[in-house]
Each structure stands twice: as structure tokens, then as C-alpha cells.
């Protein structure tokens, strides 16, 4: 007897339309909810940020703070009352969303117009740390917020030849107060920086093409990166803060715009230039699903805490998927 065919991938649970522009950034905010469900923030090529209710499946607010320039990154601070948005207008805006407000209360002028998204480390304290692309093409600037005080500039040695930083991930080990930064670079390397010491702890060559995005599971000390090439790289961090490549997963087509591990660390999703969303088991990297709904490049993916997956595309649509729900 032949083995039964696996069931076909599901259709989206629902689709959000109305951005009228390619979608470049997505972020769920559990702290800001409508009818008990998290709000979804989307950033578009036209410079607008839409705030969506998953209950009504409509945009409840539209924010316009980037002068028509593409919004590339979105992040809310703890409690969900403030939003950070990064645009190609060389501005990072801080929005006050408390009690229905939608005003820019501060901004940071960026030095680089590259593709690199910022990253924050905020533990519920009044002060938090922000990593942004720096003045030099290979620099990362570290700021203390909200004072915008410059902490340091992380600049590789001249002979490192890393190229531009393409993606950043600030994090902190549970047993330490020292901030660390994982950065993916144009030459295909992933680098671990000790921010306090302003030094490189470890560097690995993961990809032959620029690293477009990475995510890190601090509990398992294990990360994943995607590039402009045809492979995902899985790597780990040992107790001596040394990075090691653990394996690669070959893809059918090149180009990963974003890779995101679900909050429960069971599965991960990738946004593909080939219009596909790919879902993998995080521990084994077993492929679980290829979701072929969008008609143009998928540029961003995000998970809710309870496992709902959102994907934003160049086709101006945001698809929402319920896959392998959390137990």
C-alpha cells in the first residue's frame, strides 16, 4: 500500500487589505488589545503605519510620521503604550499610543539609509537600550533611551571586511546584566558583540550572501539566519560565548526577508522572496508547511503569543494563519 498523501497546506484564516502599498514590517502587541486580542501593527512602503483589530479585521488607526518613506521596522515598548517605527527617511519615531493618542513624542535621527532594522532591549525599566545602524557603513550605534545618550559605536576592525550590518538582535542572558548583540553582515557573517566591552566575542561565516535576518532562542542558546542565498543556517552559542554553525537547510529558491521563532520555541516561519511562507519545526528543522498564498515577495512575518502567524507581502496584503496551535 502506498502511504497516504499529507494534507494540503491550509488557507489563511483571514486576510487584511487596505494598506494600498507593499507591507514591509509587522509587529503584534500583546500589551495593547482590542476585544481581548492583540493589536497588529503594519508598516508600508508608503510610510504609513496601520494598527489593525483582529476582531473587526479592520485598521483602527493610521499613523503618518515618515514623510512617505518606507517603514522598515516596528516595535512596541513593554505595556504597549509606546511604539517605535523606523523609516527610510532616516528617522526612528517614538509614538505615544496611551488612551487613544497617536502622536510622535520623540525621534532619533539615523546615520544610515541601509536595509538594517534596529533592535531594542527593554526589561520594563524606565531606561532601555537601542541598537541602530551607525554613521560608518560598517558601524552599529548603541543608545540609551529615552535620553538618546550615545553609549558606544561597535565598529569591526578594518581588516574584518564584514561590510554593512544587515540585521541586529540585542539580548541579555538570564544570569547576566551585560547586553549582547548578534549582528548579521553583508559578507554573510554572524557576529556576537559584547556591548559593554565594545568587542567581538565570536564570528562565524554562515552564508555566501548577505544575512537578511536572524532570530535567537536565548533559552536554547541557538539561533537561525536567512540570507539572499538559498540556505538557512542554524548556529549555537556555547558557555564561552563562541558561535558554532550547527547545520544548514537548503531552500528551493533564494532570498529570505525575515525569519521568526514562535514565542513557545516550537516552530519558526520564514518570509520568502519567492512569495512563499515556510514553516519548520525549530528543534529538528523538519519542514512542516509551505504556504503559497501571496502573489509577490513575502517581506515580513510575526507571531502572536498564542501562535497566530501574520505575513506581509509586496502584494499589499497581510495574511493571518492558524498553524499548529499551542497546546
Curated annotation (Swiss-Prot):
GO terms for biological process: DNA damage checkpoint signaling; DNA damage response; social behavior. Keywords: Cytoplasm, DNA damage, Nucleus, Repeat, WD repeat. Its main location: cytoplasm. It comes from the Eukaryota. InterPro entries: WD40/YVTN_repeat-like_dom_sf, WD40_repeat_dom_sf, WD40_rpt. GO terms for cellular component: cytoplasm; nucleus. Ubiquitous. Highly expressed in heart, liver, skeletal muscle, kidney, spleen, thymus and pancreas. Detected at low levels in lung, placenta and brain. PROSITE patterns: WD_REPEATS_1, WD_REPEATS_2, WD_REPEATS_REGION. Disulfide bonds: none annotated. It is found in: Cytoplasm; Nucleus. Pfam families: WD40. Gene3D superfamilies: YVTN repeat-like/Quinoprotein amine dehydrogenase. WD repeats lie at residues 16-54, 58-97, 103-145, 153-195, 200-237, 242-282, 286-323. Acts as a critical regulator of DNA damage response (DDR) signaling via specifically regulating phosphatidylinositol 3-kinase-related protein kinase (PIKK) family proteins. This is Guanine nucleotide-binding protein subunit beta-like protein 1. It comes from Homo sapiens (Human). The gene is GNB1L.
Amino acid at each position: 500500500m502506498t502511504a497516504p498523501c499529507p494534507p494540503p497546506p491550509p488557507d489563511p484564516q483571514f486576510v487584511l487589505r487596505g494598506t494600498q502599498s507593499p507591507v514591509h514590517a509587522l509587529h503584534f502587541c500583546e500589551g495593547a488589545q482590542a476585544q481581548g486580542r492583540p493589536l497588529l501593527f503594519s508598516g508600508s512602503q508608503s510610510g504609513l503605519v496601520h494598527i489593525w483589530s483582529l476582531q473587526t479585521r479592520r485598521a483602527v488607526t493610521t499613523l503618518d510620521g515618515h514623510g512617505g518613506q518606507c517603514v522598515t521596522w516596528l516595535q512596541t515598548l513593554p505595556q504597549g503604550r509606546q511604539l517605535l517605527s523606523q523609516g527610510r527617511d532616516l528617522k526612528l519615531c517614538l509614538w505615544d499610543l496611551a488612551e487613544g493618542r497617536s502622536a510622535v513624542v520623540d525621534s532619533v535621527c539615523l546615520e544610515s539609509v541601509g536595509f538594517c532594522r534596529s533592535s531594542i532591549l527593554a526589561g520594563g525599566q524606565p531606561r532601555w537600550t537601542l541598537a541602530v545602524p551607525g554613521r560608518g557603513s560598517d558601524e552599529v550605534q548603541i543608545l540609551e533611551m529615552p535620553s538618546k545618550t550615545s553609549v558606544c559605536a561597535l565598529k569591526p576592525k578594518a581588516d574584518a571586511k564584514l561590510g554593512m550590518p544587515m540585521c541586529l538582535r540585542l539580548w541579555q542572558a538570564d544570569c547576566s546584566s551585560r547586553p549582547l548583540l548578534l549582528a548579521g553582515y553583508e559578507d554573510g557573517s554572524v557576529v556576537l558583540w559584547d556591548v559593554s566591552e565594545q568587542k567581538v566575542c565570536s564570528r562565524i561565516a554562515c552564508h555566501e550572501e548577505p544575512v537578511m535576518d536572524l532570530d535567537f532562542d536565548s533559552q536554547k542558546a541557538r539561533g537561525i539566519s536567512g540570507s539572499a542565498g538559498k540556505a538557512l543556517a542554524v548556529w549555537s552559542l556555547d558557555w564561552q560565548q563562541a558561535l558554532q554553525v550547527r547545520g544548514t537547510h537548503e531552500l528551493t529558491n533564494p532570498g529570505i526577508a525575515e525569519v521568526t521563532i514562535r514565542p513557545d520555541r516550537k516552530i519558526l516561519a520564514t518570509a520568502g522572496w519567492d512569495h512563499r511562507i515556510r514553516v519548520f519545526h525549530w528543534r529538528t528543522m523538519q519542514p512542516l508547511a509551505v504556504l503559497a498564498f501571496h502573489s509577490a515577495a513575502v517581506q515580513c512575518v510575526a507571531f502572536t503569543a498564542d501562535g497566530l502567524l501574520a505575513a506581509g507581502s509586496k502584494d499589499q496584503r497581510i495574511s493571518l494563519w492558524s498553524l499548529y496551535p499551542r497546546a
